[in-house]
Amino acid sequence: MSMIPISNRRRLSPGDRIWEPFELMNTFLDFPSPALFLSHHFPSLSREIFPQTSSSTVNTQLNWTETPTAHVFKAYLPGVDQDEVIAFVDEEGYLQICTGDNKFMSRFKLPNNALTDQVTAWMEDEFLVVFVEKDASSSPPQLPEIEENRNVRVVEITGDDD
Protein backbone atom coordinates (compact mmCIF):
# COMPACT_ATOMS: atom_id res chain seq x y z
CA MET A 1 0.00 0.00 0.00
CA SER A 2 1.30 3.41 -0.89
CA MET A 3 0.18 6.66 0.66
CA ILE A 4 -0.04 9.86 -1.36
CA PRO A 5 0.14 13.20 0.46
CA ILE A 6 -2.61 15.67 -0.29
CA SER A 7 -1.61 19.32 -0.16
CA ASN A 8 -1.86 22.54 -2.14
CA ARG A 9 1.71 22.16 -3.38
CA ARG A 10 2.30 20.56 -6.75
CA ARG A 11 5.62 18.84 -5.98
CA LEU A 12 7.35 17.65 -2.88
CA SER A 13 10.80 18.81 -1.96
CA PRO A 14 13.37 16.04 -1.34
CA GLY A 15 13.00 16.50 2.42
CA ASP A 16 9.23 15.99 2.24
CA ARG A 17 9.50 12.64 0.50
CA ILE A 18 7.44 9.88 2.01
CA TRP A 19 9.29 6.79 3.10
CA GLU A 20 8.34 3.75 1.05
CA PRO A 21 9.30 0.46 2.76
CA PHE A 22 9.71 -1.45 -0.52
CA GLU A 23 12.12 1.14 -1.91
CA LEU A 24 14.99 -0.68 -0.20
CA MET A 25 14.31 -3.76 -2.33
CA ASN A 26 14.25 -1.84 -5.62
CA THR A 27 17.39 -2.96 -7.42
CA PHE A 28 16.72 -0.70 -10.41
CA LEU A 29 16.73 2.55 -8.42
CA ASP A 30 20.04 3.79 -9.85
CA PHE A 31 19.66 2.05 -13.21
CA PRO A 32 19.85 4.61 -16.05
CA SER A 33 16.77 4.80 -18.25
CA PRO A 34 17.45 4.85 -22.03
CA ALA A 35 14.60 7.31 -22.54
CA LEU A 36 16.07 9.75 -20.02
CA PHE A 37 19.57 9.34 -21.47
CA LEU A 38 18.36 10.02 -25.02
CA SER A 39 16.18 12.96 -24.07
CA HIS A 40 19.04 14.58 -22.13
CA HIS A 41 21.89 14.03 -24.60
CA PHE A 42 20.03 13.83 -27.94
CA PRO A 43 16.76 15.79 -27.69
CA SER A 44 15.97 15.78 -31.42
CA LEU A 45 16.55 12.02 -31.72
CA SER A 46 14.46 11.26 -28.65
CA ARG A 47 11.51 13.18 -30.15
CA GLU A 48 11.64 10.88 -33.19
CA ILE A 49 11.86 7.67 -31.14
CA PHE A 50 9.48 8.70 -28.35
CA PRO A 51 6.98 11.10 -29.97
CA GLN A 52 4.67 13.16 -27.82
CA THR A 53 1.33 11.41 -28.24
CA SER A 54 -0.84 13.53 -26.00
CA SER A 55 -2.45 15.67 -28.71
CA SER A 56 -1.38 13.85 -31.85
CA THR A 57 -3.59 10.77 -31.51
CA VAL A 58 -7.30 10.10 -31.53
CA ASN A 59 -8.70 8.55 -28.37
CA THR A 60 -10.85 5.82 -29.89
CA GLN A 61 -12.73 2.69 -29.01
CA LEU A 62 -13.19 -0.10 -31.54
CA ASN A 63 -15.56 -3.05 -31.45
CA TRP A 64 -15.64 -6.08 -33.76
CA THR A 65 -18.79 -8.18 -33.71
CA GLU A 66 -19.69 -11.16 -35.85
CA THR A 67 -23.28 -11.67 -36.95
CA PRO A 68 -24.59 -14.65 -38.94
CA THR A 69 -24.26 -12.65 -42.18
CA ALA A 70 -21.35 -10.24 -41.63
CA HIS A 71 -18.43 -8.95 -39.59
CA VAL A 72 -19.23 -5.49 -38.20
CA PHE A 73 -16.54 -3.06 -37.02
CA LYS A 74 -17.57 0.06 -35.08
CA ALA A 75 -14.97 2.68 -34.21
CA TYR A 76 -15.57 5.81 -32.16
CA LEU A 77 -13.52 8.57 -33.79
CA PRO A 78 -14.15 11.86 -31.97
CA GLY A 79 -13.35 14.98 -33.96
CA VAL A 80 -12.68 13.08 -37.20
CA ASP A 81 -14.64 13.96 -40.35
CA GLN A 82 -15.90 11.43 -42.85
CA ASP A 83 -13.47 12.69 -45.49
CA GLU A 84 -10.47 11.99 -43.23
CA VAL A 85 -11.19 8.26 -42.68
CA ILE A 86 -9.78 5.55 -44.96
CA ALA A 87 -10.97 1.93 -44.72
CA PHE A 88 -9.76 -0.77 -47.11
CA VAL A 89 -8.93 -4.47 -47.36
CA ASP A 90 -5.50 -5.32 -48.74
CA GLU A 91 -4.61 -8.35 -50.86
CA GLU A 92 -3.56 -10.36 -47.78
CA GLY A 93 -7.03 -10.09 -46.24
CA TYR A 94 -6.31 -7.40 -43.64
CA LEU A 95 -8.88 -4.68 -42.97
CA GLN A 96 -7.08 -1.41 -42.30
CA ILE A 97 -8.85 1.61 -40.82
CA CYS A 98 -6.87 4.84 -40.58
CA THR A 99 -7.14 8.59 -40.75
CA GLY A 100 -5.42 10.66 -43.40
CA ASP A 101 -3.24 12.45 -40.84
CA ASN A 102 -2.21 9.14 -39.17
CA LYS A 103 -3.77 10.00 -35.82
CA PHE A 104 -5.47 6.61 -35.81
CA MET A 105 -4.58 3.31 -37.49
CA SER A 106 -5.74 -0.23 -36.82
CA ARG A 107 -5.44 -3.51 -38.77
CA PHE A 108 -7.45 -6.71 -38.48
CA LYS A 109 -6.90 -10.09 -40.13
CA LEU A 110 -10.27 -11.04 -41.58
CA PRO A 111 -11.39 -14.68 -41.33
CA ASN A 112 -11.49 -16.89 -44.41
CA ASN A 113 -15.28 -16.62 -44.69
CA ALA A 114 -15.15 -12.82 -45.15
CA LEU A 115 -16.01 -11.54 -48.62
CA THR A 116 -13.31 -8.91 -49.01
CA ASP A 117 -14.84 -7.50 -52.19
CA GLN A 118 -18.13 -6.70 -50.41
CA VAL A 119 -17.12 -4.09 -47.84
CA THR A 120 -19.26 -1.06 -47.03
CA ALA A 121 -18.43 1.74 -44.60
CA TRP A 122 -20.27 4.81 -43.36
CA MET A 123 -20.14 7.38 -40.56
CA GLU A 124 -22.94 7.87 -38.02
CA ASP A 125 -22.26 10.91 -35.82
CA GLU A 126 -18.68 10.19 -34.65
CA PHE A 127 -18.89 6.42 -35.23
CA LEU A 128 -17.38 4.66 -38.22
CA VAL A 129 -19.22 1.45 -39.16
CA VAL A 130 -17.49 -1.04 -41.47
CA PHE A 131 -19.63 -3.92 -42.72
CA VAL A 132 -17.85 -6.96 -44.23
CA GLU A 133 -20.16 -9.61 -45.72
CA LYS A 134 -19.62 -13.30 -44.91
CA ASP A 135 -19.71 -16.23 -47.31
CA ALA A 136 -23.16 -17.85 -46.93
CA SER A 137 -21.96 -21.19 -48.28
CA SER A 138 -19.50 -21.67 -45.43
CA SER A 139 -21.17 -23.43 -42.55
CA PRO A 140 -20.67 -22.38 -38.93
CA PRO A 141 -18.35 -24.54 -36.84
CA GLN A 142 -20.05 -27.71 -35.64
CA LEU A 143 -20.31 -28.33 -31.92
CA PRO A 144 -19.45 -31.83 -30.76
CA GLU A 145 -22.51 -33.97 -30.13
CA ILE A 146 -23.18 -35.07 -26.58
CA GLU A 147 -23.35 -38.81 -26.17
CA GLU A 148 -26.45 -40.14 -24.47
CA ASN A 149 -24.63 -42.85 -22.55
CA ARG A 150 -21.94 -40.90 -20.74
CA ASN A 151 -20.99 -43.38 -18.03
CA VAL A 152 -22.96 -41.60 -15.31
CA ARG A 153 -23.26 -43.20 -11.88
CA VAL A 154 -25.92 -42.19 -9.35
CA VAL A 155 -24.70 -41.91 -5.76
CA GLU A 156 -27.12 -41.91 -2.84
CA ILE A 157 -26.27 -39.44 -0.10
CA THR A 158 -27.20 -40.51 3.41
CA GLY A 159 -26.77 -38.74 6.66
CA ASP A 160 -28.38 -37.72 9.92
CA ASP A 161 -31.29 -35.31 9.70
CA ASP A 162 -30.99 -33.12 12.79
From Swiss-Prot:
First and last residue of the signal peptide: none
Subcellular location: Cytoplasm
Main location: cytoplasm
Biological processes annotated in GO: response to oxidative stress
GO cellular component, one term: cytoplasm
Keywords: Cytoplasm, Stress response
Ranges where the sHSP domain occurs: 53-149
Heme keyword on record: no
Subunit composition and interactions: May form oligomeric structures.
Family according to the record: Belongs to the small heat shock protein (HSP20) family.
Protein name stated in the entry: 18.5 kDa class IV heat shock protein
Organism: Arabidopsis thaliana (Mouse-ear cress)
